[in-house]
From Swiss-Prot:
It holds the Pfam family Ribosomal_L2. HAMAP family: Ribosomal_uL2_B. GO terms for biological process: cytoplasmic translation. SMART domains: Ribosomal_L2, Ribosomal_L2_C. This is Large ribosomal subunit protein uL2. One of its GO terms (cellular component) is large ribosomal subunit. The keyword Acetylation does not apply. It comes from Geotalea daltonii (strain DSM 22248 / JCM 15807 / FRC-32). The lineage of its organism: Bacteria, Pseudomonadati, Thermodesulfobacteriota, Desulfuromonadia, Geobacterales.
Length: 274
């Protein structure tokens, strides 16, 4: 993937950059793997905002992605590499030998015509999925399960990868994109390689309206609000808030640790690096 810049024909265009989409091979998704999703606007079933700064955006269709890779020992050929509006990575359409079609997250260097397979004895090449116990130490992996059969939860966004560090008894140690080292059951599935679309992090939005197209609403600073809306609000003229930074609900923020001790804490070997 490469980044495309524009001539400064307007203030919004001046710093705007965009993907060239040169790796995309088709513009129409597979109809059998597409469903409609209604936008929530960040509201729950009571109509109350549970996720702030969400709303609007272009209408999108959700592509059903195979995160489980549970179709074992049947080879599949990559039919196309496509854009997915719901994620930063590209997706690849697989045509299995038995006629079934599925989408997967497209790893780096996966091309149309390549063959991939999910198997305990699969080759160590990008796109193949194996149980972690069958993967050699030091291998770059993505799409990692946390619970057997639940589907991949770790290292799924553009350009991310994890590394297999060690194996002991029924657990493997995996170094995650954040720097955290975590124990994962060795029977969990993982996919070989790094997620594609590496230049996603280099894209510059360029203007406020483009964020609105993506369904992102403005984030208003607390010091710009009234006292009724935020603990930092109010005051005569411009103020700094008058207290240590807090959320709208009065909880300390900007570095304050809010994570509660969970049962999964014991699986963290090394905390993430800042």
């Amino acid at each position: 993937m490469a980044i495309k810049s524009y001539k400064p024909t307007s203030a919004g265009r001046r710093h705007q950059t965009c993907s060239t989409f040169e790796e995309i091979t088709t513009s129409q998704p597979e109809r059998s793997l597409v469903v409609k999703l209604k936008k929530t606007g960040g509201r729950n079933n009571f109509g109350r905002i549970t996720s702030r700064h969400i709303g609007g955006g272009h209408k999108q269709k959700y592509r059903i992605i195979d995160f489980r890779r549970d179709k074992r020992d049947i080879p599949a050929k990559v039919a196309s590499v496509e854009y997915d509006p719901y994620r930063s990575a590209r997706i690849a359409l697989l045509n299995y030998a038995d006629g079934e079609k599925r989408y997967i997250i497209a790893p780096l260097d996966l091309k149309v015509g390549d063959t991939v397979v999910a198997s305990t004895s699969a080759d160590i090449k990008p796109g193949n999925a194996l149980p972690i116990r069958s993967i050699p130490l030091g291998t770059i992996i993505h799409n990692i399960e946390l619970k057997i059969g639940k589907g991949a939860q770790l290292a799924r966004s553009a350009g991310t990868f994890a590394q297999l560090m060690a194996k002991e008894e029924k657990y493997a140690q995996v170094k995650l994109p954040s720097g955290e080292v975590r124990m994962v059951l060795m029977d969990c599935m993982a996919t070989i390689g790094q997620v594609g679309n590496l230049d996603h992090e280099n894209v510059s939005i360029g203007k406020a309206g483009r964020s609105r197209w993506l369904g992102k609403r403005p984030k208003v600073r607390g010091v710009a609000m009234n006292p009724v809306d935020h603990p930092h609000g109010g005051g005569e003229g411009r103020t700094s808030g008058g207290r240590h930074p807090v959320t709208p609900w009065g909880i300390p923020t900007k570095g304050y640790k809010t994570r509660t001790n969970k049962t999964s804490t014991r699986f963290i070997v090394k905390r993430r690096t800042k």
